[in-house]
Amino acid sequence: MSSLPRRIIKETQRLMQEPVPGINAIPDENNARYFHVIVTGPNDSPFEGGVFKLELFLPEDYPMSAPKVRFITKIYHPNIDRLGRICLDVLKDKWSPALQIRTILLSIQALLSAPNPDDPLANDVAELWKVNEAEAIRNAREWTQKYAVED
């Protein structure tokens, strides 16, 4: 860990000592810039009861550039495509070095509670979300049961 910037060490320590409710982020034992993340589907959302695996990677120039984050678990969501890429302003143009790993994880958790079909990455999902929200929510619940609920 000594070759890591102090900021990454501090953020990692804080994540371990003060975990975010519903989120578990563990640094990889071979690469402290890579995190194995588990996000629990928020209550009262179509993703409730789901356990979603994500990967988070801090690029060499972090915090000048945003972390790279993607869902590994399949999810039916207008802002997350089939490859797990996430459409979230703080991961793109709204990124600021003042933000931290925990801010990003909280933003992703909030995105699960409030999908935004007006800024989609998965156009087909967003379209259904706009024209028949009830069916889209049903699909999201089905995918959650199928892909994100541990037996």
Curated annotation (Swiss-Prot):
It catalyses: S-ubiquitinyl-[E1 ubiquitin-activating enzyme]-L-cysteine + [E2 ubiquitin-conjugating enzyme]-L-cysteine = [E1 ubiquitin-activating enzyme]-L-cysteine + S-ubiquitinyl-[E2 ubiquitin-conjugating enzyme]-L-cysteine. The active site is at residue 87. The keyword Acyltransferase does not apply. GO terms for cellular component: cytosol; nucleus; perinuclear region of cytoplasm; UBC13-MMS2 complex. The keyword Ribonucleoprotein does not apply. Pathway: Protein modification; protein ubiquitination. It comes from the Eukaryota. Residues 3-149 form the UBC core domain. Its EC number is 2.3.2.23. Disruption phenotype: Mutants in this gene exhibit several, largely neuronal defects including lesions affecting the neuronal connectivity of the giant fiber with the 'jumping muscle', and the axons of photoreceptor cells R7 and R8 fail to make the proper right-angle turn into the medulla (hence the term 'bendless'). GO terms for biological process: axon target recognition; axonogenesis; flight behavior; grooming behavior; jump response; peptidoglycan recognition protein signaling pathway; photoreceptor cell morphogenesis; positive regulation of JNK cascade. Belongs to the ubiquitin-conjugating enzyme family. This is Ubiquitin-conjugating enzyme E2 N.
